[in-house]
Amino acid sequence: MKYNDDNIQTGNTGNHLHNIGVHFTIAKGFTYAAKTVYGLGGTTFQFFSRNPRGSKAKVYLDKDIAQFQRLRKEYKLGPIMAHAPYTINLASPNESLRSFSREVVKDDIIRMESLGIEYYNLHPGNYLGEDKSEGIKQIIEGLNEAITKEQGITVLLETMSGKGSEIGSRFEELRQIIDGIVFNSKVGVCMDLCHMFSSGYDIVHHLEDVMNEFDQVIGINRLKGIHLNDSKNGFNSKKDNHAPIGEGHIGLEATLQLMEYPQLCSLPFYLETPLEDEGHRQEIQMLKCNLQK
């Protein structure tokens, strides 16, 4: 599959099968984000639920939210994903950080639910070289405090790259967490391509085997969204360094094959690549032009 730049267009034609979007800031509001992403050719987006390097939560204006909800219908935007801040760690051996993390997750779920956001994605946690089983236990306890039977939003556990003491780089770890959640019908998985490749799942040469394993261990019905990115580092590197699509070790062809995989093609795809708006516009169009229609 070769990238053909002759067909690159701007804007959103609105008639493409795949639901592709980007990670985008809401610093200027949801309305601005929706308009900009749609103008880039996207049909969904991901945003941080609060300051990704801190704890401050943005106050949303009612007028902005109302306009955003109208635009969602007008643009026919797919599921919107909120990403938890990097400062939380539900698996931390530090009780203070763990308590802070639980409060943030609980508050975020309530806030995102009130906005009609479909998915709340988080990194499961890092046991910081202590006891992995205790770390998994703490993640389960934290999520059980936050997830309710009545909520509509789905909490997603992100697949991780396996660097350091991260939890979530193996399907079995994610399954263990899910099994411990009381209301686990409210829990799913977000697959990050760079993380998957870096953690040792060969999505380039053995995609079908990887997806079969995912289905057997977790269940394909749990997979709700995909972070699109390439990897600056090689296979099984245990490193988390994103690259633009086609400029890393995963490559464009493998990315397209994954997006066309029968059990994945209807999922929302969120670009998490180190590019600005124009780069993302070109990336979205590159993917659309090369995908089967």
What are these regions (language model features)?
Residues T36-G41, L61-M81, D108-G116, A146-Q151, ...:
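Acidic (Asp/Glu)-rich catalytic clusters
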Residues V37, H83, S101, M112, ...:
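Conserved, mostly hydrophobic/aromatic
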Residues H23-A27, R50-P52, A84-T87, G125-Y127, ...:
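Active-site beta-loop-alpha junctions enriched in small/polar residues
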Residues Q46, K224-H227, S266-T273:
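Conserved active-site loop/cleft motifs that coordinate metal ions or position small ligands
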Residues E74, L90-G188:
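Active-site acidic/histidine proton-transfer and metal-coordination neighborhood
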Residues F45, I140, N144-A243:
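Acidic/histidine-rich catalytic cores of soluble enzymes
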Residues S96-I109, K132-N144, R170-G180, L207-D215, ...:
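Short, electropositive alpha-helical surface patch
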Residues M1-A84, I88, S92-I110, K293:
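N-terminal pre-domain/capping segments
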